[in-house]
Regions:
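Sec-dependent N-terminal signal peptides
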Residues: 4-12
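Boundary at the C-terminal end of the N-terminal hydrophobic targeting segment
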Residues: 16-18
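Juxtacatalytic substrate-recognition/specificity segment
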Residues: 20-160, 262
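Alpha-helical packing segments of well-folded alpha/beta enzyme cores
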Residues: 41-45, 233-236, 277
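Acidic/His/Gly-enriched intrinsically disordered linker/tail segments
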Residues: 133, 137, 153-233, 242-299
Length: 300
């Protein structure tokens, strides 16, 4: 069986650092519980990638967590300053990222920011229940940190002679992160653990079957947004992982950093050109039998 798959009071959050752990910044209110929440999730996610895929990050990673989106950027700026870095992008839109979401999250070089709805009371029950929701999402965002690290993409690189970012395509970046988020849910949390390979494939295929978005649509940086986009990207990366093994999703970014060429990296790892895979994906995304054969390596 394949198992898959009051503002001034909060403004100066206390950082928490540990060996082989992310640098945690969170609010002063309920600081111990929030730090424990983030630290436990960080440890579990790092162990998941190290134990299952031999993937580790030695460079510092900032992990910001808050229940107040209004001060998310203050935490982040303090964390970056402590690390001797500066924010290279526009401030994060905390309201958009966090508002009315059980867990909101985003990643960039070299940080992950997370937020959650403020509960009536902070206690151990809150920590445990929130941790169950937060950890898989952290696995998704930590995948992005691995992608940056493997590709040597901090600061972000450009494709030679263009203004386009080297790291990509967007569906590969987000689809891979979605795959490892799902794997964490299955392998660590036991979600859908009894599903066989066929059921897992069917479940992953369903959102892509409904979406009209193509992989070409999801190639530009930042194009993978919304359920349909994420579902399509997830299935595209999932097929590659089923066909070549999940480790191949990491190998692509490693070779991308060496070759500085998306096409070379993709063909070297998966034995197909991007163009060929885009064509194959359209052929199999709504055909379960064809998708099964492709995932098994029985068809090109």
């Amino acid at each position: 069986m394949l198992r898959w798959l009051v503002l001034a009071f909060w403004l100066t959050g206390t950082p928490s650092f540990g060996q082989n752990a992310s640098r945690i910044y969170t609010d002063l209110q309920a600081n111990a519980l929030k730090t424990a929440l983030l630290s436990e999730a960080d440890n579990k996610v790092r162990a998941f990638f190290a134990d299952q895929f031999d993937q580790r990050i030695t460079a510092p990673v900032i992990l910001v967590g808050t229940s107040d989106p209004d001060i998310l950027n203050e935490h982040l700026m303090k964390a970056l300053t402590d690390l001797g870095r500066r924010q290279r992008t526009s401030p994060i839109d905390g309201a958009k990222l966090c508002d009315n979401k059980k867990i909101g999250a985003a990643a960039n070089r070299p940080y992950i920011v997370m937020c959650w709805l403020k509960p009536k009371v902070y206690d151990d029950r809150w920590r445990v229940l929130t941790g169950q929701k937060l950890a898989p999402i952290l696995a998704h965002e930590f995948t992005h940190q691995l992608q940056y690290d493997l590709a040597g993409d901090d600061p972000a690189q450009r494709i030679a002679g263009t203004k386009k970012l080297l790291l990509g395509p967007s569906w590969m970046i987000e689809g891979s992160a979605e795959v490892f988020e799902q794997m964490y849910k299955v392998q660590i949390q036991g979600k859908d653990v009894d599903d066989d390979a066929a059921q897992s494939l069917f479940n992953m295929q369903s959102p892509a079957r409904r979406s009209r978005l193509t992989l070409s649509d999801l190639t530009p940086t930042g194009s993978t947004k919304g359920r349909g986009a994420y579902g399509t990207a997830r299935f595209a990366a999932y097929l590659l992982a089923r066909r070549n093994g999940p480790q191949a999703l990491f190998q692509y970014f490693e070779i991308l950093g060496q070759a500085k060429d998306r096409d070379i990296a993709f063909e070297q790892v998966f034995g197909l050109t991007f163009k060929a895979y885009e064509t194959n994906f359209e052929r199999v995304r709504r055909d379960f039998a064809a998708a099964t054969e492709f995932a098994a390596g029985e068809t090109q």
